[in-house]
Curated annotation (Swiss-Prot):
<dbReference type="InterPro" id="IPR018136">
    <property type="entry name" value="Aconitase_4Fe-4S_BS"/>
</dbReference>
<dbReference type="InterPro" id="IPR015931">
    <property type="entry name" value="Acnase/IPM_dHydase_lsu_aba_1/3"/>
</dbReference>
<dbReference type="InterPro" id="IPR036008">
    <property type="entry name" value="Aconitase_4Fe-4S_dom"/>
</dbReference>
<keyword id="KW-0100">Branched-chain amino acid biosynthesis</keyword>
<dbReference type="GO" id="GO:0046872">
    <property type="term" value="F:metal ion binding"/>
</dbReference>
<dbReference type="InterPro" id="IPR001030">
    <property type="entry name" value="Acoase/IPM_deHydtase_lsu_aba"/>
</dbReference>
<comment type="function">
    <text>Catalyzes the isomerization between 2-isopropylmalate and 3-isopropylmalate, via the formation of 2-isopropylmaleate.</text>
</comment>
<keyword id="KW-0004">4Fe-4S</keyword>
<keyword id="KW-0456">Lyase</keyword>
<feature type="binding site">
    <location>
        <position position="410"/>
    </location>
    <ligand>
        <name>[4Fe-4S] cluster</name>
    </ligand>
</feature>
<keyword id="KW-0028">Amino-acid biosynthesis</keyword>
<comment type="similarity">
    <text>Belongs to the aconitase/IPM isomerase family. LeuC type 1 subfamily.</text>
</comment>
<comment type="pathway">
    <text>Amino-acid biosynthesis; L-leucine biosynthesis; L-leucine from 3-methyl-2-oxobutanoate: step 2/4.</text>
</comment>
<feature type="binding site">
    <location>
        <position position="347"/>
    </location>
    <ligand>
        <name>[4Fe-4S] cluster</name>
    </ligand>
</feature>
<keyword id="KW-0479">Metal-binding</keyword>
<feature type="binding site">
    <location>
        <position position="407"/>
    </location>
    <ligand>
        <name>[4Fe-4S] cluster</name>
    </ligand>
</feature>
<keyword id="KW-0432">Leucine biosynthesis</keyword>
């Protein structure tokens, strides 16, 4: 029987399935951070349990960390407690920790791939909703709750129902100035934020195959934003070239055997998907969200829609509330919308290619008066690479702030946040009310579009700069 990529990876990890029961699957990689792990480790202590596979578990600090100081106290008392608790827990249970001063510290979904923890055909979980990022490698990766974190720590397994399958094909070739972020925002604009609920999505098509690994990570990162359990891209030569030689990637004969196996992990001809969607890559333009969920998105040159444009009453009501919260009006041009802040970073767009894209726009230009623009590398490795290339100098000379790695302004869990009423061009993944700070207004864009907005002081088509 012909199988999809998802079905192949899932079935390879079923360790037990009783009749009428939810399957139990094996977990190959468990990534841990400071926010969703404390209660899980406490649960192990209370029951006298150990971490079953300390060699399959890795921890880092990212959500709470300060991006201006390596001082553990710099982000406030709650952050200090969570980070110190992670240090104690990883020490007590023998779990490797890439802490504030470690060369591999960074956002968990940036760190994992760049050191070779993320491999095709593996199952990967983390107590974080954007774990789908790792699906770019042909892995089955998804976020879990804290009780499930405890279960994986104790057993290295998880009860997991089979998901429905969805194929999203992006055909053709995208034009200049159109990025992976624009592709995935355009997809979510078509599906809405619930279109993928109950599905694992496989992204495919010539426009997807043409993406670099970092670009594929951006696409899979936001699979959760269309409601999907996970997003996947089949591994290919681009994947193998990215992984070869990374610290945790197989070596020598093991590498050859791994590539041979990984090459079988693709959807068979004739395999049936439960749902399919096709987008024309050439028709995608730079995207900007206008509302309070990622599905409320339009191309930069499209006027902001009116609530009455939506046939569905729920969508109509949501649009009305979004316009009020965002202080926008139907028919308004995005180019007329001024910003207060720009944020370039996050697990969606905090990698070296993202920093390069922002620097290319910033070079020889200046941040607009009254705009604060932050560039936050996704990891210590990204930071070091960017500095080796002189990108930090280009950005700071243009008036951008060059920060230390962390989740930063993606979410209001550290010192980087919006004040009420402030408007931000952000390369992160969520534009919910208050996501970047109480009363803050978030517009999701690509790194190049965020840099362009920072320089002009308002949203602008980066292709016209």
């Amino acid at each position: 029987m012909a199988k999809t990529l998802y079905q192949k990876v899932f079935e390879a990890h079923v360790v037990y399935e009783a009749a009428g029961e939810t399957p139990i699957i094996y977990i190959d990689r468990h990534l841990v951070h400071e926010v969703t792990s404390p209660q899980a480790f406490d649960g192990l202590r209370e029951k006298g349990r150990k971490v079953r596979r300390t060699d399959r578990t890795w921890a880092t600090m990212d959500h709470n960390v300060s991006t201006t100081s390596n001082d553990i106290n710099a982000s406030g008392e709650m952050a200090r407690v969570q980070m110190q608790t992670l240090m104690k827990n990883t020490d007590d249970f023998g779990v490797p920790l890439y802490g504030l001063n470690h060369k591999w510290q960074g956002i968990v979904h940036v760190m994992g791939p760049e050191i070779g923890l993320t491999l095709p055909g593996t199952t990967i979980v983390c107590g974080d909703s954007h774990t789908a990022t790792h699906g770019a490698f042909g892995a089955l990766a998804f976020g879990i709750g804290t009780s499930e974190v405890e279960h994986v720590l104790a057993t290295q397994t998880l009860k997991q129902s089979r998901a429905k399958t969805m194929k999203i094909e992006v055909t053709g070739k995208v034009g200049p100035g159109v990025t992976a972020k624009d592709i995935v925002l355009a997809i979510i604009g078509k599906t809405g934020t619930a279109g993928g609920t109950g599905y694992v999505v496989e992204f495919c098509g010539t426009a997807i195959q043409a993406l670099t690994m970092e670009e594929r990570m951006t696409v899979c990162n936001m699979a959760i934003e269309l409601g999907a359990k996970a997003g996947m891209v089949a591994a290919d030569q681009t994947t193998f070239d990215y992984l070869k030689g990374r610290p945790f990637a197989p070596k020598g004969a093991d590498w050859d055997a791994a590539v041979e196996y990984w090459s079988t992990l693709k959807t068979d001809a004739g395999a049936k998907f439960d749902a399919e969607l096709v987008l024309d890559g050439a028709a995608i333009e730079p995207q900007v969200t206008w509302g309070t969920n990622p599905g409320q998105v339009i191309s930069i040159n499209t006027p902001i829609p009116a609530p009455e444009d939506f046939a569905d009453p729920v969508a109509r009501s949501s649009a009305q509330k979004a316009l009020e919260y965002m202080a926008l009006t139907a028919g308004q041009k995005l180019s007329d919308v001024k910003i207060d802040k720009a944020f370039i970073g996050s697990c969606t767009n905090g990698r070296i290619e993202d920093i390069r894209a922002a620097a290319a726009v910033a070079k020889g230009r200046k941040v607009a008066p009254g705009v604060q623009a932050l560039v936050v590398p996704g990891s210590q490795q990204v930071k070091a690479q960017a500095e080796a290339e002189g990108l930090d100098k280009i950005l700071t000379e243009a008036g951008f702030e060059w920060r230390l790695p962390g989740c930063s302004m993606c979410l209001a869990m550290n010192n980087d946040r919006l004040e009420p009423g402030e408007r931000c061009a952000a390369t992160s993944n969520r534009n919910f009310e208050g996501r970047q700070g109480r009363g803050g207004r978030t517009h999701l864009v690509s790194p190049a579009m965020a840099a362009a907005a920072a320089i002009t002081g308002h949203f602008v088509d980066v292709r016209e700069l």
